[in-house]
UniProtKB/Swiss-Prot annotation:
This protein's UniProt keywords: Amino-acid biosynthesis, Cobalt, Diaminopimelate biosynthesis, Hydrolase, Lysine biosynthesis, Metal-binding, Zinc
Role, per record: Catalyzes the hydrolysis of N-succinyl-L,L-diaminopimelic acid (SDAP), forming succinate and LL-2,6-diaminopimelate (DAP), an intermediate involved in the bacterial biosynthesis of lysine and meso-diaminopimelic acid, an essential component of bacterial cell walls.
Subunit structure: Homodimer.
Active site: 71, 135 (proton acceptor)
Protein name (Swiss-Prot/TrEMBL): Succinyl-diaminopimelate desuccinylase
Pfam families: M20_dimer (PF07687), Peptidase_M20 (PF01546)
Reaction catalysis annotation: N-succinyl-(2S,6S)-2,6-diaminopimelate + H2O = (2S,6S)-2,6-diaminopimelate + succinate
Record text on cofactor binding: Binds 2 Zn(2+) or Co(2+) ions per subunit.
UniProt-listed HAMAP family: DapE (MF_01690)
Gene responsible for this protein: dapE
This protein's pathway: Amino-acid biosynthesis; L-lysine biosynthesis via DAP pathway; LL-2,6-diaminopimelate from (S)-tetrahydrodipicolinate (succinylase route): step 3/3
Cofactors demanded by this protein: Zn(2+); Co(2+)
EC number: 3.5.1.18
């Protein structure tokens, strides 16, 4: 009997799986997949829940993979929600709740498609699902743990589809063939405290750091590349912790976040930031220290067989040819890309992480149909 992806989405939304809690979501998926003949393994690391499921022979020449997550961000002020954030309520043509868009509907649609596919037309190959409970958190023990376990166990995917919401306005208009890299730079400026009436007796870390931030934010990192928009740098914090208006503080901190294309690497940008900080430090006499956190490098799955497979299926079901894009934030595709070619396609993501997150019910069944067509065409 075919699985209803709308009902499954609602059931998953009712699982309060705020990172790092599993909330019953992976248990539910495991029961469904096990009942359909998938070999399921829980790959939990450091208390983080993950699920690996495979239908078909281990080591098959053609193995289609799916990656997704069931963890969700916190609801915030629950009183601000129109409906219960974990109610999975369907009203006015929408399915409401935390994770409805990001990305329990995508997971439900692929689970439903995969079960229908292997039961109706068993493929000559394997279908693998890697579902994590650590995408919205630190992402260190989720998809990374699954891929580590797969490598150790001799499990593999030939290609992978990530079911993140990718469409800005209409189902079918966009897929992701890559992502920008992301890094955060933490600056600490240390000067000499003093009276604001005698600035010559102090070394002002606020002025020095402001100069550095101005240099960074006014610099064009690049003007875009063939498949990527221009890299961006955003100032996200600037703090002194100084309540006194007549005191030049001894310490000032600032943070910038850079989303970068394939013209750069995390290492090359770190070197640039260090050089800029050293210039300002030399000019002002203020010590400026940098600590950089690189969340992921940019990557691209060049347009080809996988992206064309996805595009054809999307166009057949929606009438829209999806634009291949690298825009937006990071996703777990940044980890999968080292394992196999990866493309992302999912629903419209306008309300993800918002109060009253919801997904249009009319999109969920077509998404299942797209995923089912992708599977059929891949193994044809």
């Amino acid at each position: 009997m075919p699985i209803d992806p709308v009902a499954l989405t609602a059931d998953l939304v009712r699982c309060p799986s705020v990172t790092p809690e599993e909330g019953g979501a992976l248990d539910l998926i495991e029961r469904i997949l096990s009942g359909a003949g998938f070999d399921c393994t829980r790959v939990d690391r450091n208390g983080v829940p993950n699920l690996f499921a495979r239908w078909g022979r281990k080591g098959a020449n053609r193995t289609f993979g799916f990656n997704g997550h069931t963890d969700v961000v916190p609801v915030g002020d629950a009183a601000a929600w129109t409906r219960d954030p974990f109610g999975g309520e369907i009203a006015d043509g929408w399915l409401w709740g935390r994770g409805a868009t990001d990305m329990k509907s995508g997971v439900a649609a692929f689970v439903a498609a995969a079960v229908d596919f292997v039961q109706e037309t068993p493929p000559d190959g394997a279908v693998v699902l890697t579902i994590t409970g650590d995408e919205e958190g630190d992402s260190t023990d989720g998809t990374v743990a699954l891929l580590d376990w797969m490598a150790a166990e001799g499990e593999a995917m030939s290609v992978c589809l990530v079911g993140e919401p990718t469409c800005p306005e209409r189902l079918g208009e966009m897929m992701k063939i890559g992502r920008r890299g992301s890094m955060t730079a933490f600056f600490t400026a240390r000067g000499v405290q003093g009276h604001s009436a005698y600035p010559h007796r102090a070394k002002n870390p606020v002025a020095a750091l402001a100069r550095l931030i101005d240099r960074l934010s006014s610099h064009d990192l690049d003007y875009g590349t063939e498949h990527f928009d221009a890299s961006t740098l955003a100032v996200t914090t600037f703090d002194t912790g100084n309540p006194a208006t007549n005191v030049i503080p001894a310490l000032c901190r600032a943070t910038v976040n850079i989303r970068f294309n394939d013209a750069h690497s995390g290492a090359s940008l770190t070197r640039w930031l260090e050089e800029e900080a050293a210039r300002v430090a030399a000019d002002t006499g203020v010590e400026i220290a940098l600590s950089a956190k690189i969340s992921g490098e940019s990557f691209l799955t060049p347009p080809g067989e996988l992206s064309e497979l996805v595009a054809r299926a999307v166009e057949a079901e929606t009438g829209l040819r999806p634009e291949p894009s690298t825009s937006g934030g990071t996703s777990d595709a940044r980890f999968v890309r080292a394992h196999c070619p990866v493309v992302e396609f999912g629903l419209v993501g306008k309300t993800m992480h918002q109060v009253d997150e919801r997904v249009e019910v009319a999109q969920i069944e077509p998404l299942k149909a797209i995923y089912l067509r992708i599977l059929k065409d891949y193994f044809a």
